[in-house]
């Protein structure tokens, strides 16, 4: 988990450092990862003690004081005292609180900061929604296709069973007819004094054949029952997938795009753009204004997570000698061609469609 220690850039003294959080300059105690709330409020023309009087602030402090998930131990609410007339000492004096309170305090100080954080949160959940919607749509298409195959297979099995039932009925009828004829022949032969042992053996063989056909029919019926059970399971999954689907938003300008460009750049001829549609178009125009030759090699519309997608691309292609510099790419010293580069990106993009149905 990220810490305010990660935004520290200048040591004040001992374990106290200056840090930067958005547009706010912080005083951070690296030993506790807490920040100086007094100094933060003063920088925005407000007083920390006024924030502590708010009902919401009281509930927040009470909540975090009651938590026991801090691996460092000790208090996360403490005051550093000293002679504020001493310039060096006064830089670190004040009330220190947990990093979890910085969002509420900073939003109380600055409406602009609140608006910026609110937009970040909205963008995050919109992207998350689109990823889930796309995945559910893909799963639904696979489930529907499998259901269609199972139905066709079940229909074929039922047709085969009907044919065997008809054949069994014919054999049963033939057997009964044969028995009747044998009985008549037996009586005739008996009256003539002829041995009928051979005729009985032939009749037994015919009865054995009927028994084997009955066993085959039972096995087919069991197969049909198994297929019907699979169809029921798929129907349940299909109903769940349908219930989880959400409506597709209509704003194309907010949809994410991943674009691969080729430019007449001596060092990095390939360039990637990862942004919402409206910003991606602007980025392409900037490249066209900067270079004489700009060609779009690949354009993936509505990719749910271009950041994670690009990280996966870099991880795979660095192993093949491809060089990356932020959004720029060079394959001159690699083992792949331009065609390989495009195909590799398309292959990684297609992996998101893989779905396993248990």
Curated annotation (Swiss-Prot):
Domain KilA-N: 15-124
Protein name per its UniProtKB record: Putative KilA-N domain-containing protein 313L
InterPro entries: DUF3627, KilA/APSES_HTH, KilA_N
Coiled coil: 126-245
Keywords in alphabetical order: Coiled coil
Cleaved signal peptide residues: none
Pfam families to which the protein is assigned, alphabetical: DUF3627 (PF12299), KilA-N (PF04383)
Homology family: Belongs to the IIV-6 006L/238R/313L/468L family.
